[in-house]
């Protein structure tokens, strides 16, 4: 893989609780270049925790450790809050799951996107507005000037997620982390939004971490798939080779996918092996 932007080796995340420290992520390793990497697994497997760790978005109760956690020339483990503020949004951005919880309901859409740009760059307001209009056009919004002046409740869910994509990409980051960005959308709208995201990521040569539980989605959208179970990576495989997955957990997830062409009287139940909690993905 060319142009490695992000290097993660033995990332572990623990949270302090009343009952002691809880391991949420254990010894996760991967690299990311100009590609689309999916992180998949069931709820609670540690997918989002990995994504948030890269931006240091965890609460003070979290402890992040790693042998290597490097973004370009920056050691993220040693980076202070001032340095991280310069990275968040400008060089590495995160698209959240549901725009109705991410967008400010009392602030016009265009002003919110412009704010994401102006916090990192000094531009005249008029120039920033034109940049926002261009970005709304880039995410295939047909009437960008109307949407610019709209409030979040005046646009649809699919359009809201396009607005979030525009907001996260307008500062021209190097890496985008998309945390279940289409799970709140209808299937038809989901594919449209993913097509927009794919087009922009590819055209700009960005790295993408796509967090999802939908194996069918990542199979057609991503280059590589990293499968997590109970905070560990159990398998990393090319998306095109998912049907040849070797780990029983990955195969179990694939077997549980509904198949519209073949009726099954009973959906398979994934049988878990305690050894999965101790084994590590081969390096």
Model-inferred region functions:
Residues 170-174:
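A short, proline-enriched helix->beta-strand linker immediately N-terminal to the Walker B motif
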Residues 218-220:
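A short, surface-exposed alpha-helical micro-motif characterized by mixed small hydrophobic
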Residues 75, 127-146, 254-255:
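Conserved ABC ATPase "signature" region
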Residues 4, 21, 142-146, 236-283:
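Short catalytic/signature loops enriched in Gly
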